[in-house]
Amino acid sequence: MPATRIDGKAIAAKLREDVAAEVARLKRDHDLTPGLAVVLIGNDPASEVYVGSKTKQTVAAGMASFEHKLAADTPQAQVLALIARLNRDPAVHGILVQLPLPKGLDATIIVNAIDPAKDVDGLHPVNAGRLASGLPALTPCTPLGCIILAKTVHASLEGMNAIVLGRSNLVGRPLVQLLLNENATVTIAHSRTRNLPALCRQADLVFAAVGRPEMVKGDWIKPGATVIDVGINRLPGEGGKSRLVGDVAYAEAMEVAGAVTPVPGGVGQMTVACLLVNTVRAACAIKGLSAPSV
């Protein structure tokens, strides 16, 4: 029997509805409008699309959106000055600098300049450290989305064997911490891991975030496992057009797994929705309010 297709698009839409309801409550009860500032440097086409989507969804949720577009040759000192101004702005509760940055700009220095309380990408070392310590923290959006998707299949992840393929600071490492906080038993794998297919076959939960098209084959997957595919890879398609695939061989996985996220229509849909969640959480924390329901 084919696996269940995890509909990230529908789950993200429901999450955005919940965020909009929470924003309306904050406006009504506390005169608080969560505000998100997005900084886009340069004219990378993919980044422009991402920022446009973030701005549109922020406004649709009833939040304040502040978009700052800078030229690719903007000096780093000017970028840091903008971030310092946003850190002080009481109308801004979340700050996101769209990555990757143009050459000549140091992403580490720029990200670390963001006030950790407004770091809705969850990349500041303070938030990474709090997450690793099991303390409340703003969490990177994609790993947060992965956990939400997995919990639509399993009410609890406690005691489950999970494997995370990929150890990036953006996805793999924070995802491991989130899984540990859920009391899952976690293996983290990477390019140097030995016997990777055998390790995958032991996992109840497989999270693929390696950036290698269709690397995870059907015979890597334990029957009935849940597979969350974070990869977004573009391959040549018919008629000179390209096609998007994940890090998992989707058709093969559907014949073995219990549930699988598609690409597109899976994890990617959750990332912006979780950015909205983080912005609302940041706004409540900054204003000294109890944690929101989303």
Curated annotation (Swiss-Prot):
One of its GO terms (cellular component) is cytosol. GO terms for molecular function: methenyltetrahydrofolate cyclohydrolase activity; methylenetetrahydrofolate dehydrogenase (NADP+) activity. Its EC number is 1.5.1.5, 3.5.4.9. Pfam families: THF_DHG_CYH (PF00763), THF_DHG_CYH_C (PF02882). Transmembrane segments: none annotated. Pathway: One-carbon metabolism; tetrahydrofolate interconversion. It comes from the Bacteria. GO terms for biological process: L-histidine biosynthetic process; methionine biosynthetic process; purine nucleotide biosynthetic process; tetrahydrofolate interconversion. NADP(+) binds at residues 166-168, 191, 232. CDD domains: NAD_bind_m-THF_DH_Cyclohyd (cd01080). It catalyses: (6R)-5,10-methylene-5,6,7,8-tetrahydrofolate + NADP(+) = (6R)-5,10-methenyltetrahydrofolate + NADPH; (6R)-5,10-methenyltetrahydrofolate + H2O = (6R)-10-formyltetrahydrofolate + H(+). Keywords: Amino-acid biosynthesis, Histidine biosynthesis, Hydrolase, Methionine biosynthesis, Multifunctional enzyme, NADP, One-carbon metabolism, Oxidoreductase, Purine biosynthesis. Catalyzes the oxidation of 5,10-methylenetetrahydrofolate to 5,10-methenyltetrahydrofolate and then the hydrolysis of 5,10-methenyltetrahydrofolate to 10-formyltetrahydrofolate. Homodimer. Belongs to the tetrahydrofolate dehydrogenase/cyclohydrolase family. This is Bifunctional protein FolD. It comes from Afipia carboxidovorans (strain ATCC 49405 / DSM 1227 / KCTC 32145 / OM5) (Oligotropha carboxidovorans).
